[in-house]
Structure formats: C-alpha cells, structure tokens
C-alpha cells in the first residue's frame, strides 16, 4: 500500500485569524496508494504516552494538522492515516499519536492568540510534565531565582 516515502519534509500552515505561520519538518512521511499519509518521528529517548502527547508533546499532532491543511506542498496529500513515534534505542518501540482525540489546531490557535496580546507575559515553565524535574532551559531562564508559583511579570521596553 506504499506509494512513496519522503524524509525530512518541510511543511507549514498559517492560522488565518492571526497570520501566524507554523513551520515544521517531518522526519518521514509515507504516501499510500489510497491517497492518505503516515507520518513518522524518530526518537532516541523515551516515547511520549498518549496523555503526554495530548498535554505536552504535540509535535506529531501538529504535523498531522499541517498535512491536513495542505502544508506539505510536495506531497499533495490531505488526509493522515496514522502518525507514529518510532523509538530507535536498544529495541524498536512504537507509539501512535492520538489523532482526532483533541482539538489540537483550535487549542494551538488560542495559545498563539494569547501570546500575541501585548499584556500577556511569557513564562519559561508554562506546561511542565513534572515541576521538580529540571528543564533543558532552566539555566537560560534563570530558574531558581524565581518560583513556579509566581506569575510572569510584563516589563515593557
């Protein structure tokens, strides 16, 4: 059922109400004979659970939304059959994305709209899986000089 396979495919989709364009690169997209596509993302670390994908790790879900909006121009496909994380550690693992279980594009649009409001402050730890686990960006954000119970302070420059 495989028609063609494409690696490192760039795509983009624009939120019509804000003009914001989301750009992303899919690790692999397989186009099937029935006109649908399978999207794959390779991971060397732990694969996200369904709950993590719905709340924190929306990469594949957003790539699927880009594809459904015609954002992968070179593929000419508008329907996603499946989106899957592939773990490439010591043993092969698969984790399917929960397509259709969440209003991903609507929620993404709402998030972007909120940050386009000049009165909305930015926070370094907006949606942490576990607050007590260090983030790759904690040092950059100077975490430790402030706490997670503090609201971001808007400083106009």
Which residue ranges define each predicted feature?
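RecB-family 4Fe-4S metal-dependent nuclease core
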Residues: 1-157
């Amino acid at each position: 059922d495989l028609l063609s396979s494409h690696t490192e495919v760039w795509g983009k989709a624009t939120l019509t109400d804000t003009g914001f364009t989301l750009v992303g690169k899919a690790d692999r997209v397989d186009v099937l004979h029935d006109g649908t596509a399978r999207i794959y993302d390779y991971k060397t670390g732990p694969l996200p659970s369904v709950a993590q994908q719905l709340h924190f790790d929306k990469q594949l879900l957003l790539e699927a939304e880009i594809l459904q909006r015609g954002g992968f121009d070179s593929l000419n496909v508008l329907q996603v059959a499946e989106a899957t994380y592939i773990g490439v550690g010591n043993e092969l693992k698969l984790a399917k994305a929960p397509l259709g279980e969440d209003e991903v594009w609507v929620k993404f649009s709402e998030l972007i709209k909120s940050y386009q409001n000049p009165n909305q402050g930015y926070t370094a730890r907006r949606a942490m899986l576990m607050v007590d686990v260090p983030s790759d960006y904690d040092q950059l954000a100077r975490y430790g000089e402030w706490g997670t119970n503090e609201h971001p302070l808007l400083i106009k420059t």
